[in-house]
From Swiss-Prot:
It is found in: Cell inner membrane. Plays a role in cell envelope biogenesis, maintenance of cell envelope integrity and membrane homeostasis. The keyword Cell membrane applies. Belongs to the YciB family. It comes from Pseudomonas paraeruginosa (strain DSM 24068 / PA7). Pfam families: IspA (PF04279). PANTHER family: INNER MEMBRANE-SPANNING PROTEIN YCIB, INTRACELLULAR SEPTATION PROTEIN A-RELATED. GO terms for cellular component: plasma membrane. This is Inner membrane-spanning protein YciB. It is a multi-pass membrane protein. The lineage of its organism: Bacteria, Pseudomonadati, Pseudomonadota, Gammaproteobacteria, Pseudomonadales. The gene is yciB. Keywords: Cell inner membrane, Cell membrane, Membrane, Transmembrane, Transmembrane helix. Its main location: membrane.
């Protein structure tokens, strides 16, 4: 559910980008098209993550990082009227997540995915490592896919940012679910998970 809440600002960004046909001048800035969508992304991110923080008095590190990247790169996009800053957001965020997941093999006693999901499921250590590596690869692929689309198909990147990223995430989560289903402890049969 958390990942879908994280997509709310992105979906609003897409909607404003697609339906904002007019030029809006605000404080000397033209906020049509990508710039109106960027302003919407920033505002929606602040509202969504602000509401989550007010409700739970806590945001996950990934949410803080995503919010920070949105504020900094979105702010630079608006301040300099240059969309290149925003175009680098998805690749940078994905690559830094990949770095965090990869680094967790060397820092601490558990891979990142085990720290996130370990309270909910039990797996042998070798499977946690494999699952964590899969997340590293997923984040790297998402980052490079975003970068490729941004600079190869500049008229399509907003569509890909929403639908491509969401589609890749859903496919990966389905694949992860299938992988986990094969290895989870079966409480009824008493079988041990496969390594």
């Amino acid at each position: 559910m958390k990942q879908f809440i994280d997509f709310i600002p992105l979906v609003l960004f897409f909607i404003v980008y697609k339906i904002d046909p007019q030029n809006v001048e605000f404080a000397g800035f033209n906020l049509s098209g990508i710039y109106g969508a960027t302003a919407t992304l920033i505002l929606a991110s602040v509202i969504v993550y602000g509401a989550l923080w007010l409700k739970h008095r806590h945001l996950e590190k990934s949410q803080w990082f995503t919010l920070g990247a949105c504020l900094v790169l979105g702010g630079l996009t608006l301040a300099f009227h240059e969309d290149t800053f925003l175009k680098w957001k998805a690749p940078l965020v994905n690559w830094l997540f990949a770095l965090a997941f990869a680094g967790s093999h060397f820092i601490g006693d558990k891979p990142m995915i085990q720290r996130i999901m370990g309270h909910a499921i039990q797996l042998p250590q070798g499977l946690w490592v494999r699952l964590n590596i899969a997340w590293v690869v997923f984040f790297l692929v998402c980052g490079f896919a975003n970068l490729y689309v941004v600079f190869t198909y500049p008229n399509f990147w907003v569509d890909f940012k929403v639908f491509g990223s969401l589609g890749m995430t859903l496919l990966f989560l389905i694949g992860q679910g299938i992988f986990l289903a094969r290895h989870l402890h079966d409480a009824d049969t008493g079988e041990k998970p496969k390594d």
